[in-house]
Amino acid sequence: SVGFKAGVKEYKLTYYTPEYQTKDTDILAAFRVTPQPGVPPEEAGAAVAAESSTGTWTTVWTDGLTSLDRYKGRCYRIERVVGEKDQYIAYVAYPLDLFEEGSVTNMFTSIVGNVFGFKALRALRLEDLRIPPAYVKTFQGPPHGIQVERDKLNKYGRPLLGCTIKPKLGLSAKNYGRAVYECLRGGLDFTKDDENVNSQPFMRWRDRFLFCAEALYKAQAETGEIKGHYLNATAGTCEEMIKRAVFARELGVPIVMHDYLTGGFTANTSLAHYCRDNGLLLHIHRAMHAVIDRQKNHGIHFRVLAKALRMSGGDHIHSGTVVGKLEGERDITLGFVDLLRDDFVEQDRSRGIYFTQDWVSLPGVLPVASGGIHVWHMPALTEIFGDDSVLQFGGGTLGHPWGNAPGAVANRVALEACVKARNEGRDLAQEGNQIIREACKWSPELAAACEVWKEIVFNFAAVDVLDK
């Protein structure tokens, strides 16, 4: 009979459509689905498509007032995950009209909203998203991108060097500024506010901005190189955040910083727009990411958070080190490093990339390697990340036995030695330690650093690894 028929019907009758041909304008998602016992995978995949688009738990008569065929998400393919019991990859296609233009916030509210608390699923993880060019073009993206940043800084042909000022909390503004000066004077390109430095009683933001700007200009004058300090503009309200960014611009500094996950995508996109309009570079820290991305069966993979950041806007983002103290398997890390930097990335399941991604003209983001790295890691980092990256040594600079400036000198000498060796055709993976030892002969600072950190390793297996 025609007309409204009340009652509950299975999701898969409406939302599981294996015959569907995906459109170029669809947003495609790959979900790792772990259904509850007794729930067939088709029903679980269809439930994800329904609950993250037009569906609800029962038939409603207002369905008759719209075209569900036009607006519904569709689960169009399901694959069993090899080597895992009761895990499936469900592919879902979303029509573009479901999403507001230029809003990462709206995209995530749909795709990773209520559906993650759905009772029929034991666990759910968003592994990857394909953002169609039609949607990419509605975003400004990074304020400047890799090439414009190099032109602003006049630094080419090598990775950039940074350092997070430690201890991260407790220093006064003047002492903080002094540490910034010493690191920049020693040869680093950037120093960085820690992500939790905002405006606390021991150091208010305005005092920190002033002393850091003074340090920066002094180091610039003495070295003849352009220097930067990531001034953390993250604040409790968007208005306060923009106020801090305005003050940074008035001081004439080149770069500010934001914690994009704790601050939120709306705040981040607002700041990115301000930065492009006012010539500021934007460094992004990913505090809170491991809460979301570290478990293999539930949450959102970091490659999705990285894509979202490229859309929302940021010129640098922390992306793991492969060799330091923080999580990150090599192939997975290189997969999302490519997604940050390149214009076009082919599907490659061996690196965890589920979809071919075309960024059209969206600028690239520099990946930042940071966390437990020191001079002995320099050859590996140079080889893994290449020139378009920022290598950040916090303890690896400030922990030098002779002080901050010699720590910076050691890092700069090690980097220049690795870049020179690579350009001469030497194999950094095989000869790395030899290259560093040779450089020690003419740099006592580097020799001292090598002696201190020769035994330090962080040998733990990664939690989030590729499927077999």
From Swiss-Prot:
Record site: Transition state stabilizer? 325
PTM annotation, UniProt: The disulfide bond which can form in the large chain dimeric partners within the hexadecamer appears to be associated with oxidative stress and protein turnover.
Quote the subunit structure annotation: Heterohexadecamer of 8 large chains and 8 small chains; disulfide-linked. The disulfide link is formed within the large subunit homodimers.
What the entry lists under PROSITE patterns is as follows:
RUBISCO_LARGE
The protein's name: Ribulose bisphosphate carboxylase large chain
Q: Which Gene3D superfamilies match?
A: Ribulose bisphosphate carboxylase, large subunit, C-terminal domain, RuBisCO large subunit, N-terminal domain
Q: List, separated by semicolons, the cofactors it needs.
A: Mg(2+)
Q: What are the entry keywords?
A: Calvin cycle, Carbon dioxide fixation, Chloroplast, Disulfide bond, Lyase, Magnesium, Metal-binding, Methylation, Monooxygenase, Oxidoreductase, Photorespiration, Photosynthesis, Plastid
Which residues are recorded as binding substrate? 114, 164, 168, 286, 318, 370
A single GO molecular function, which one? magnesium ion binding
Q: What is an annotated GO biological process for this record, any one?
A: reductive pentose-phosphate cycle
Question: How is the cofactor bound, as the UniProt entry phrases it?
Answer: Binds 1 Mg(2+) ion per subunit.
Alphabetical list of PANTHER family matching this protein: RIBULOSE BISPHOSPHATE CARBOXYLASE (PTHR42704), RIBULOSE BISPHOSPHATE CARBOXYLASE LARGE CHAIN (PTHR42704:SF16)
**Where is the PTM N6,N6,N6-trimethyllysine found along the chain?**
5
> InterPro entries this protein is in?
RuBisCO, RuBisCo_large_chain_AS, RuBisCO_lsu_C, RuBisCO_lsu_C_sf, RuBisCO_lsu_fd_N, RuBisCO_lsu_N_sf, RuBisCO_lsuI
- Note, other: The basic functional RuBisCO is composed of a large chain homodimer in a 'head-to-tail' conformation. In form I RuBisCO this homodimer is arranged in a barrel-like tetramer with the small subunits forming a tetrameric 'cap' on each end of the 'barrel'.
List, alphabetically, the GO terms of the cellular component aspect. chloroplast
Location, primary (coarse class): plastid
Catalytic EC class: lyase
Catalytic activity annotation: 2 (2R)-3-phosphoglycerate + 2 H(+) = D-ribulose 1,5-bisphosphate + CO2 + H2O; D-ribulose 1,5-bisphosphate + O2 = 2-phosphoglycolate + (2R)-3-phosphoglycerate + 2 H(+)
State where Mg(2+) binds: 192, 194-195
